[in-house]
Amino acid sequence: MKTKLKIAATLTIVQTLLMGATIASAQNGRVVNDSWLYENYTKREVMVEVRDGEKIYTAIYEPTDEYLSRIGKQKSPIMLTLTPYSRKPYGLKPGETENGKIRGVYYSGLTGDMANYVADGYIIVVQNVRGKFLSTGTYENMRPYVSGVDGAADTVVVDGKVQTDDATDVYDSVEWLLANTKNTGIVGVKGVSYGGFYTTMATLAKHPAIKAVSPQAPATDWYMGDDAHHNGALCLTDSYRFGGGFYRDFRKPSAVGMSNLVKIKEDIYEYFRGKPMDELSAFFGDSLRFWSDMMKHPDRDQFW
């Protein structure tokens, strides 16, 4: 099921002029905080329909025309990031309050790792990948790449079913964004860990508008070198405790994440020491598809 991604070192961080001017702007007296965002950025949430009919939750943060004018720009490049994690707040618009405060309306990354891009007037786009939170469809833990060497432009149909992967979702999303935002036609994609994997998929999509990517510490091979296994050895603590919540399927789109089935109050070493794998797996039953798949494939095979 999982195809090992062979990623050239040159792909790890591809920085172009798209991303080159951000440092200076943060030093020009623009302090990006929630109040500043309220004055200079708008927020809208849309469901972008992709080629198989599923809909991807997309939060779009756009500079106002007044702000673009002040910094001498008419249009903005797009910075896209994709995640399986919550990117709350969902539903709130600028000017609305959460617990009586404007703070919380904006995705927190806008004042963090995205602050330089925001100061430069970028359009910031945050998506939940399919099957997570408000995005429809079924989540698969690192979907295999099926689009082929030419990228994700063409729709592939097998036995009457449209074939999709994270690259096709990115390609279709970029098409929508180019048509529905005030942009320069230039897109960058960045992300860390899971986000790094989705950034890699964005690269493989080969959309001509994607000019720069930064897949940082990407998840790429669950069996050899990531949080599920290290060189084939099961990473029990992370897979079991983290997976007890993250691997659960959303029954329907929701702004609220799934609770964790695992509640370990004692010393975790002692907890695992006293339990065979069969007992640990029986605790989950059939509720965690990825855990069940790992138990069915203890050795490196075509699944990985």
Regions found by a protein language model. Give the residues of each.
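Bacterial N-terminal signal peptides that target proteins for export
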Residues: 1-12
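Bacterial N-terminal signal peptides
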Residues: 10-20
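N-terminal cap/lid segment of alpha/beta-hydrolase-fold proteins
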Residues: 30-74
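Cap/lid segment of the alpha/beta-hydrolase catalytic domain
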Residues: 70-178
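Accessory cap/linker subdomain of secreted extracellular hydrolases
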Residues: 100-103, 107-113, 119, 144-155, ...
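Catalytic nucleophile serine of serine hydrolases
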Residues: 135, 193-194, 217
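Alpha/beta-hydrolase fold nucleophile elbow
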Residues: 181-193
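Glycine-rich nucleophile elbow surrounding the catalytic serine of serine-hydrolase chemistry
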Residues: 191-201
